[in-house]
């Protein structure tokens, strides 16, 4: 089962609720590429057998390799439980969404929180969490 961007975003909790305004130091628009490391039961319809502990170990190994300079796109191809290339444009809270972007409020909370804190080229991680990142671990690289 291959997930495309639109279904994956729906799966990852797309909501239309307006939240508070973006923080002044945060950018208005970003583009990120991510690797989703799920675990058994975290992605409905995907037969993932790893445990949450195995997912955490794998996610942090990928993060370490990425921060050491491994080709991020190659890591996405090799490891993501989302569709390749895993690139998403996002507009911040209170900012109009440009063509091809998704509103930050429509993404899993931790995904946007990490993405908007990164500088271009930086890599971070959103830990699996039932409320803020229920689909697994997101290794996120800000590309724009």
Label the model's feature ranges.
Residues 2-12:
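Bacterial N-terminal signal peptides
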Residues 8, 26, 130-131:
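Sterically constrained small-residue positions within well-ordered secondary structures
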Residues 18-30:
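Acidic/polar surface patches and capping/hinge elements
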Residues 29-34, 139:
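A residue-level signal for beta-strand positions that form part of recognition/binding surfaces
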Residues 33-46:
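Acidic/histidine-rich, surface-exposed loop or edge segments in extracytoplasmic proteins
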Residues 48-144:
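Peptidyl-prolyl cis-trans isomerase
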């Amino acid at each position: 089962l291959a997930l495309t961007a639109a279904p994956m975003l729906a799966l990852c909790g797309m909501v239309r609720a307006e939240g508070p305004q973006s923080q002044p130091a945060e950018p208005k628009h970003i583009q990120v590429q991510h690797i989703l490391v799920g675990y058994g039961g975290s992605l409905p319809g995907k037969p993932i057998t790893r445990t949450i502990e195995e997912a955490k170990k794998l996610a942090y190994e990928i993060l370490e390799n990425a921060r050491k300079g491994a080709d991020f796109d190659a890591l996405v191809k090799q490891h993501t439980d989302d569709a390749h290339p895993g690139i998403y444009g996002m507009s911040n809270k209170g900012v109009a969404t440009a063509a091809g972007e998704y509103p930050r409020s429509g993404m899993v909370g931790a995904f946007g929180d990490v993405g908007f804190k990164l500088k271009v080229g930086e890599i971070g991680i959103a830990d699996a969490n039932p409320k803020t990142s229920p689909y697994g671990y997101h290794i996120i690289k800000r590309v724009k």
